[in-house]
Design a protein with these regions (language model features):
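Protease-associated
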Residues: 160-195
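Intrinsically disordered, low-complexity regions enriched in acidic/Ser/Thr/Pro/Gln residues
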Residues: 2-168, 174-175
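Feature captures the catalytic cores and cofactor-binding loops of soluble hydro-lyases/lyases
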Residues: 181-256
């Protein structure tokens, strides 16, 4: 796994990973496994940025991925420290430089029914830039599709979450789950960046739809390929073509 060197980024996660699901007794007396919701506020240089509702795991990765894919920062090199409190209610991200922000009236941001809210925005959002090309191998897509078909632990238990895989050099290196497809992608991007993986060598596979906001996230992450079992919209396909992002959509999971 090739990595690139990055300035030291300190992570203090006092919350860690909590139980991702629990058993719920249904009216008929049977039990079902249901996912847990966790609410957290993300701050940048002690200024409010986002409120997220997510699964209670990988909060530093979620915060880093969200800032990258929403255009707050251009790279992880800008981040000096990420700190999560013991309750997991607050995620503090400290940058190596001041970042002028403006307080926004609370507004919903895409989160796949997770009540995600933007609390602020950078004065100058990072622009979209063309992504590099990558020679995608058919067997890579088949490997990702098979992994999605097999399912990750939380999905197998609840059938109620989204997944996002990171593939590099034909191998799946990260697999993340969350209540929403946007959160799952942000966690996957955060994992890859913290591991020092070059974005230009990575492929993302999302279990969710691929509208404009998901394509923007992939472009800002710098990945050259986004795979999904769902089809894109006209607008997202046009944006992907404009910036060189390869979309491989309609990769249906086989029924059993």
């Amino acid at each position: 796994m090739e990595k690139r060197s990055t300035p030291s980024l300190q992570i203090t996660d006092r919350f860690g990973a909590q139980a991702a699901f629990a058993s719920l007794r249904l009216p008929d007396g049977t039990e079902a496994s249901v996912p847990a919701e966790h609410a957290a506020a993300i701050y940048v240089n002690e200024q409010p940025a986002f409120r997220v509702v997510c699964t209670p795991a990988l909060l530093p990765q979620l915060a880093l991925g969200r800032l990258l894919t929403e255009g707050w920062i251009a790279s992880a090199d800008e981040v000096e420290q990420i700190a999560v409190c013991a309750e997991g209610a607050k995620v503090q991200v400290y940058l190596r430089h001041p970042l002028p922000t403006r307080r926004a009236a609370a507004q919903e941001v895409a989160g796949c029914c997770t009540d995600n809210i933007a609390l602020g925005s950078p004065v100058e959002q990072q622009p979209l830039r063309p992504v590099p090309g990558l020679a995608l191998q058919p067997e890579w897509v088949e490997r990702l599709t098979a992994a999605m078909h097999a399912g990750l632990p939380l999905y197998r238990a609840t059938r109620a979450v989204h997944s996002c895989f990171v593939l590099q050099g034909g191998e799946i290196v990260f697999a993340c789950e969350d209540l929403g497809r946007h959160n799952a992608l942000d966690k996957a991007v955060g994992c890859a960046v913290l591991a020092g993986l070059p974005p230009a060598e990575c492929v993302l596979y999302t279990s969710g739809r691929v509208p404009l906001d998901m394509v923007r996230k992939a472009i800002r992450a710098g990945v050259p390929v986004l795979v999904s079992k769902s089809m894109p919209t006209v607008q997202s396909a046009e944006l992907a073509a404009e910036y060189g992002l390869q979309l491989v959509c309609g990769r249906k999971i086989p029924k059993v």
